[in-house]
Amino acid sequence: VVGGDECNINDHRSLVRIF
């Protein structure tokens, strides 16, 4: 996803943050 490193740490949380 857009996060990159952050996505690796929290996939589900990153999605919520992006949207």
UniProtKB/Swiss-Prot annotation:
Q: In which tissues is it expressed?
A: Expressed by the venom gland.
What GO cellular component is one of the record's annotations? Answer: extracellular region
Q: Which GO terms describe its molecular function?
A: serine-type peptidase activity; toxin activity
Is Translocase given among the entry's keywords?
no
An annotated GO BP:
proteolysis
Enzyme Commission identifier(s): 3.4.21.-
Record keywords: Blood coagulation cascade activating toxin, Disulfide bond, Glycoprotein, Hemostasis impairing toxin, Hydrolase, Protease, Secreted, Serine protease, Toxin
Per the similarity annotation, which family is this? Belongs to the peptidase S1 family. Snake venom subfamily.
Oligomeric state and interaction partners are given as: Monomer.
User: What name does the UniProt record give this protein?
Assistant: Thrombin-like enzyme purpurase
What organism is recorded for this protein?
Trimeresurus purpureomaculatus
